[in-house]
């Protein structure tokens, strides 16, 4: 018989603020540098992201994605920063949205942070995550006729791909 242990995660200040204001989320353990991590369901991303923008997280430093492994979920993440005048150590938080690999869809945050434009396109191009409402969602790195999502861990690389002449 094995014992399961559940680690109690200390909610950070942003998570506490979200809870006080009625936003559904789950606090995750902070990363190695102390950045607060928050798990958000795809349906609640836009209301929560809009609230965080109003709360002062005015800079999307990075948006990206990763694959948890074959048959497992894909993750779309958003690293937000509160940029204010004369601050040496701005407040940072990272949102994570876990998506099913068979239909990875989440609303685009482009309309909140314009910096998401090319970053969401790259996540689409490499992992196949559909960012609903994105104005230009198309491949950005791979050729338009490329089949599959190259950074997924279950991706099988084609044996041959013929480059087309530019002329």
UniProtKB/Swiss-Prot annotation:
Q: What is its EC number?
A: 7.1.1.-
Question: What's the chief localization of this chain?
Answer: membrane
One BP annotation, GO: photosynthesis, light reaction
Q: What highest taxon heads this organism's lineage?
A: Bacteria
| Keyword field contains NADP | yes
Reaction catalysis annotation:
a plastoquinone + NADH + (n+1) H(+)(in) = a plastoquinol + NAD(+) + n H(+)(out); a plastoquinone + NADPH + (n+1) H(+)(in) = a plastoquinol + NADP(+) + n H(+)(out)
Q: What class of enzyme is it?
A: translocase
Subcellular location per the Swiss-Prot or TrEMBL entry: Cellular thylakoid membrane
Q: What does this protein do?
A: NDH-1 shuttles electrons from an unknown electron donor, via FMN and iron-sulfur (Fe-S) centers, to quinones in the respiratory and/or the photosynthetic chain. The immediate electron acceptor for the enzyme in this species is believed to be plastoquinone. Couples the redox reaction to proton translocation, and thus conserves the redox energy in a proton gradient. Cyanobacterial NDH-1 also plays a role in inorganic carbon-concentration.
Query: Could you say which protein family the record assigns here?
Result: Belongs to the complex I 30 kDa subunit family.
Record text on subunit structure and interactions: NDH-1 can be composed of about 15 different subunits; different subcomplexes with different compositions have been identified which probably have different functions.
Q: What is this protein called?
A: NAD(P)H-quinone oxidoreductase subunit J
Which gene produces this protein?
Answer: ndhJ
């Amino acid at each position: 018989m094995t014992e399961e242990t559940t680690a109690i995660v200390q909610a950070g200040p942003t998570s506490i603020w979200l809870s006080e204001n009625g936003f559904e989320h789950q606090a995750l353990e902070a990363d190695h540098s102390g950045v607060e991590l928050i798990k958000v369901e795809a349906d609640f991303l836009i209301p929560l992201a809009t609230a965080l923008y109003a709360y002062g997280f005015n800079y999307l430093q990075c948006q990206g994605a990763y694959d948890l492994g074959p048959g497992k979920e894909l993750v779309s993440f958003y690293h937000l920063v509160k940029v204010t005048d004369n601050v040496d150590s701005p407040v940072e938080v990272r949102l994570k949205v876990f998506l099913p690999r068979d239909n990875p869809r989440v609303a685009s945050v482009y309309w909140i942070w314009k910096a998401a434009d090319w970053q969401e396109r790259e996540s689409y191009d490499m992992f196949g995550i559909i960012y609903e409402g994105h104005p230009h969602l198309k491949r950005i790195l791979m050729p338009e006729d490329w089949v599959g999502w190259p950074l997924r861990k279950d991706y099988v690389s084609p044996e041959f791909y013929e480059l087309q002449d530019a002329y």
